[in-house]
Amino acid sequence: MNKSKRSFRRRLPPIGSRDQIDHKNMSSISQFISERGKILSGRVSRLTPKQQRLMTIAIKRARIPSSSPFLNNDN
């Protein structure tokens, strides 16, 4: 059986390689937090492993001074 070879183009990560990931930049951080306040996985957010680690650290740093909530329990 011949499988058809489909060429596909890998989607680029939403953050460029030169963009800084900072805990003060809430507009960029909020893209990677779910509605419930959880950190999105790398598969969902399409970040590279290095960017995912940096984003996780930035989100956790933003939670400490209450810039970002730990949980969002708005029902």
Swiss-Prot record:
The record's Gene3D superfamilies line, in alphabetical order, gives: Ribosomal protein S18
Q: Which UniProt keywords apply?
A: Chloroplast, Plastid, Ribonucleoprotein, Ribosomal protein, RNA-binding, rRNA-binding
The answer, when asked if Transmembrane is one of the entry's keywords, is no
| Subcellular location(s) per record | Plastid, Chloroplast
> Where is the major localization of this protein?
plastid
Q: Some GO term, biological process aspect, for this entry: which one?
A: translation
Pfam families the record matches:
Ribosomal_S18
> What's the name of the protein?
Small ribosomal subunit protein bS18c
Q: Which organism is it from?
A: Cycas taitungensis (Prince sago)
